[in-house]
Amino acid sequence: MNTKHIEILYEDAHILVCIKPHGVPTQSRRAGTPDMESLVKNHIYQSAPEKGQPYLAVIHRLDQPVKGILVFAKTPFAAKELNRQLQSHGFGKYYRALADGHPSQKEGTLEDYLIKDGRANTSRVCASGTAGAKLARLHYAVVEQGPFLFDQAPNDDAPRTELDIRLDTGRHHQIRVQLAHMGCPIAGD
């Protein structure tokens, strides 16, 4: 992926909103690995190289396998304001997921305590009193149910559910962990 292939939804002097494709990390610590932060920074630089290296702040992240909308701040003021809005729920985090199985309710709220294992890059549901546990809350609504085919299982007609998801919190692997705990893991996960 190069900067010509970034799908920009909105850009002004302060922010840039774009689509992050499946498989591209939001940020990467590995040199030579393309990531959205580097691609967007290169896009900004190429559009005005006379301004030098641009300022860019990632406002939120999406997991590498996830496709979705990313918001970047192009100025320190915008970064501060967008982070304030995110913390005060001035704008939300909305997702659409394809899950295996069918939830028992058409809509609901999941509240669990999650603990992160940084070395294994995993998270799991745990008891509320567990040291390091953090509250995770999401709301879901069924969009459609049926056998949906997707790239990782093109001949599989297992029951699946398309869900709209709104996060109140943004925990590590929150959606995949909470949906799996509910009995409806992300399809192909």
Indicate where each model-derived feature is located.
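RNA pseudouridine synthases
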Residues: M1-D189
